[in-house]
Amino acid sequence: MGRARPAFADSDTGHFDARKRDMRNIRLTIAYDGSNYVGWQIQPNGPTVQVAVEKAIKRLTGEEASVLSAGRTDSGVHALGQVASFQTESAIPIDGFRKALNKFLPDDVIVRDAEEVPLDFHATFSAVQKRYRYVIHNCRTHNPFLRNYVWHFHQDIDSVAMHEAAQELVGKHDFRSFESHWPNKSSSVRTVKEVTVRRQNFCPLWLGDAGQQPSDENAGEFIWLEIVADGFLYNMVRA
């Protein structure tokens, strides 16, 4: 790929002069608070994260981009590292995408990283694994400030027993019975690589790692359930 012609920023507006060049493929790592969205994918019944990202790209480059994603989160679901990709003819420097898109995105969506990747990279089909995290606030009284981010359950939960039982899911299995509206995939076989259930004394939802596990496995009000697989069927994790 040839050297890109420079893109210049207006000192007053900060807008880029997106001079055209050969087609480029841009991979974005996006974090968002899904509280105000009906999901990632474009839908007619409310705002979606995909629309917010595509509008920001249009304002930046003047192009109508179709943004692909590694996963399609549902209504109210958040993401720490959603991977997305789109193609563009813009010559904007790669770091300019991250900075400028964040200016055009709403406050609850942010591009954490932007990288130019080969044209055959596809955010959906190039994904090799996905990680989902569910957080249960296991205490007598719920915290109203966490209502959009955790599920409150007041009765005692044996997280150690949950973790032990969940290990039966690890491995390559036919998860047909876990899927709703079957069949909507060519195969219902998936490989679950890891399932962990552990308690935490704190709830740093914005961190990629749950942090240190308490010395007492039954300590901590927050139960973190994480599952990693090569892919998931529709409603498979919820089941």
Regions found by a protein language model. Give the residues of each.
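Structured-RNA-binding interfaces characteristic of tRNA pseudouridine synthases
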Residues: 14-239
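Short linear segments in intrinsically disordered or otherwise low-structure-confidence regions
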Residues: 2-4, 8
